[in-house]
């Protein structure tokens, strides 16, 4: 049974990206995955201070917050999903902060062989205009994977045209997220 960790990074409670996370989770569970869904907005993750103490000592980050727990969960997962709304053509501040703090996950980077990652993003822009937004966010995701060294990109879902919280509920994007979840 594969362990699947889904990290939803929207600061909004009834977020469209959260709906897609739950659809992905349902598909992954039906495929036999053991799924854990975490909302980053509920976690205390401070900004990286750039002190490099984690690199110099090899003992992780000196900041005592929820990032330590999240890095451990990433280490235990076979598959992880990063989900975000698109804000100003990139990932949410919550996801960017998580990515920046992952420098303290050096051990994860050395032991990440065989792990797979998925990316889910939601843009309020209509599909015809959302492509540029998604390209920038996809670049942030792929850059993160490159830093992790040996994590395989398993799938990307870029939803568009969904502005109001919950407006994605009755769209084709839900089925696409569910089907992508079944591929774990």
Set out the residue ranges of the language-model regions.
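Short, glycine-/small-residue-rich phosphate/pyrophosphate-handling segment
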Residues: 93-94, 107-154
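Beta-strand-loop-alpha "switch" segments that mediate conformational coupling across diverse proteins
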Residues: 154-160
């Amino acid at each position: 049974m594969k362990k699947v960790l889904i990290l939803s990074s929207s600061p909004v409670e009834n977020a469209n990206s959260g709906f897609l996370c739950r659809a992905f989770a349902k598909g992954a569970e039906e495929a036999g995955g053991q799924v854990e869904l975490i909302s980053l907005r509920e976690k205390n993750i401070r900004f990286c201070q750039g002190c490099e103490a984690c690199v110099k000592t090899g003992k992780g980050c000196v900041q005592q917050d929820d990032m330590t727990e999240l890095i451990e969960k990433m280490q235990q997962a076979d598959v992880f999903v990063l989900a975000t709304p698109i804000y100003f053509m990139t990932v949410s501040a919550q996801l960017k902060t998580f990515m920046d703090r992952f420098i303290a996950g050096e051990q994860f980077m050395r032991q990440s062989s065989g792990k797979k990652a998925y990316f889910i993003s939601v843009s309020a822009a209509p599909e015809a205009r959302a492509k540029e937004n998604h390209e920038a966010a996809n670049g942030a995701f792929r850059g993160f994977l490159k830093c992790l060294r040996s994590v395989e990109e398993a799938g990307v879902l870029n939803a568009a045209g969904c502005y109001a919280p919950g407006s994605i509920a009755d769209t084709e994007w839900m089925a696409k997220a569910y089907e992508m979840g079944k591929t774990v």
